[in-house]
């Protein structure tokens, strides 16, 4: 591996051992498949931000990552790097139907995000085959706007100013590379980014593949009963967007069967110690039912400290 980090053997102020970057990254080898419900936040509702001041983090506060594996390069890039355009083009092909008048997925937030990309250098130096969009808020910094706020109330995540927050969004993999290699490289890159930027809390929206939330009533009931975050991290849908579905009791379904039926990345995040916020949102534009995932990096270290890459 070409991405070893050399750090002193010490404890951070959150009790995380800083000499275990490999162990931290190792959990992401668990993901084997890419699904349509990858964790990303899609369109930012213009109606929700029309009269809202949007604050962003200075790019000077973030650290880059870059490493190689076989024919691939994994790194973070930012505007105006032309590779960001390649990332946007891949996102558009992954999320939307083809439109000859549009070739890339882009919005106002791209300028302020880090774009984690996987490049197949055997094709070219800018052939992006995987991408993630990351928005970071370091501890003790002014609150910034996140995409999840278009669907969920996440105010409680900001209560503790000692926590560094990161939203992960716009995850996608080229259709010809969906054999597990690229998603694992993306997640390893994500883990490295989390480590060097001292991220404490990761969150983002995850989707079920239909806006008919009743189709997933048992799954949503299971998540609500078994994987809700603690009160200090509790989040809930914006009320007018809240999905309406039958609430099942635990005695009315089989836990193991329901867990197996969850979308692959929701299962992967739960295995990594993630919580799922209360309720869900129906996104009729993208025909999905969305939930909010909240993940503590301390939980990741604790749960997977004995694994190696």
Task: Provide a role label for each language-model segment.
Residues 292-309:
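Long, continuous compositionally biased terminal/linker segments
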Residues 115-117, 131, 165, 292-294:
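Conserved hydrophobic/aromatic beta-strand scaffold that supports enzyme active sites
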Residues 108-117, 142, 286-291:
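A short helix-loop-beta-strand connector motif used in the catalytic cores of GNAT acetyltransferases and
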Residues 137-274, 280-281, 287-288:
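Acyl-donor binding region in acyl/amide transferases
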Residues 1-33:
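Intrinsically disordered, low-structural-confidence terminal and linker regions
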Residues 60-129, 136:
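Short amphipathic alpha-helix that is part of the acyltransferase structural core
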Residues 129-130, 278:
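A structural microfeature
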Residues 23-80:
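Conserved N-terminal entry element of GNAT/NAT acetyltransferase domains
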């Amino acid at each position: 591996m070409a991405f070893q980090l050399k750090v002193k053997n010490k404890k951070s102020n959150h009790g995380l051992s800083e000499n275990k970057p490999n162990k931290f990254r190792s959990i992401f080898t668990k993901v084997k498949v890419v699904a349509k419900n990858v964790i990303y936040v899609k369109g930012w509702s213009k109606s929700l931000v029309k009269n809202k001041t949007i604050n962003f983090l200075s790019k000077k506060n973030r650290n880059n990552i870059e490493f190689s594996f076989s024919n691939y390069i994994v790194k973070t890039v930012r505007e105006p790097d032309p590779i960001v355009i390649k990332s946007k083009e891949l996102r558009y092909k992954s999320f939307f139907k083809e439109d000859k008048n549009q070739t890339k997925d882009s919005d106002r937030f791209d300028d302020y995000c880090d774009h984690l990309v996987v490049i197949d250098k055997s094709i070219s130096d800018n052939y992006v085959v995987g991408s993630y969009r990351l928005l970071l808020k370091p501890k003790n910094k002014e609150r910034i706007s996140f995409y999840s706020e278009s669907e969920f109330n996440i105010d409680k995540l900001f209560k503790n100013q000692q926590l560094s927050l990161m939203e992960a969004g716009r995850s996608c993999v080229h259709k010809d590379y969906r054999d597990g290699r690229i998603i694992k490289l993306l997640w390893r890159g994500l883990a490295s980014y989390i480590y060097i930027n001292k991220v404490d809390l990761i969150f983002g929206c995850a989707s079920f593949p239909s806006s008919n939330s009743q189709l997933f009533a048992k799954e949503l009931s299971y998540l609500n009963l078994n994987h809700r975050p603690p009160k200090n991290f509790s989040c809930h849908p914006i009320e007018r967007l809240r999905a309406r579905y039958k609430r099942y009791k635990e005695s009315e379904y089989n836990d193991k069967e329901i867990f197996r039926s969850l979308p692959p990345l929701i299962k992967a995040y739960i295995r990594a110690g993630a919580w799922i916020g209360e309720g869900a949102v129906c996104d009729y534009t993208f025909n999905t039912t969305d939930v909010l995932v909240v993940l503590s990096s301390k939980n990741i270290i604790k749960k997977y400290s004995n694994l190696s890459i």
